[in-house]
Design a protein with these regions (language model features):
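Short loop/turn segments that flank or connect secondary-structure elements
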Residues: 2-46, 50-171
Length: 171
């Protein structure tokens, strides 16, 4: 059902910004439907220490909403972005404040599509000193992320993307 809806959104004849927004709305509906089965709760910030890759348009929106200075990144191939982004794995998101997302209502798609299927949020810890640095089990986020990526690659193939901490370095 959602996959068909996403396919229609990706291929509909409307503005790119409108289609991106529709994918976000679908992602939020999926998250709401899954909520009773998830370990994710307010104050849990384990996923906020993962390598979080976002598009430049998402970074621009965060900069506009927060007033934070955004660093412009060049377009880079996927393999380069992945290697560079991994440098931030285990580090807190620049928008994490007191274990709360300070941009929750406007968070990027990747943040909306990662939900832990663990019994407890504590089991999601990626702290290697605790012997738990494996990503938590989750439903396949590609169900939401791949159509979004396809949409962006089709209409804005050279849009820069990278780790959220690359766009917003430092305090």
């Amino acid at each position: 059902y959602k996959r068909q809806e996403l396919s229609l959104v990706v291929n509909e004849n409307s503005a790119l910004k409108s289609r991106r927004r529709k994918v976000i709305v679908i992602a939020d509906r999926v998250g709401a439907a899954l909520a009773p089965h998830l370990a994710c709760k307010p104050g849990c910030s384990h996923c906020c220490h993962m390598s979080t890759m976002i598009y430049e348009h998402e970074a621009i929106r965060l900069a506009e909403l927060t007033g934070r200075r955004m660093k412009r990144l060049p377009f880079r191939p996927l393999d380069v972005v992945a290697v560079e982004g991994r440098k931030f794995d285990g580090k807190p998101c620049p928008f994490l404040v007191d274990n709360q997302c300070s941009v929750y209502a406007d968070r990027p798609l990747v943040c909306r599509s990662h939900h832990s299927l663990r019994d407890s949020a504590e089991l999601c810890s990626m702290d290697p000193t605790l012997g738990n640095h494996v990503r938590p089990p989750m439903y396949d986020p590609d169900l939401l992320e791949v159509p979004y990526i396809e949409l962006n690659e089709k209409y804005h193939p050279l849009e820069p993307w990278g780790n959220i901490a690359e766009f917003f370095p430092g305090p």
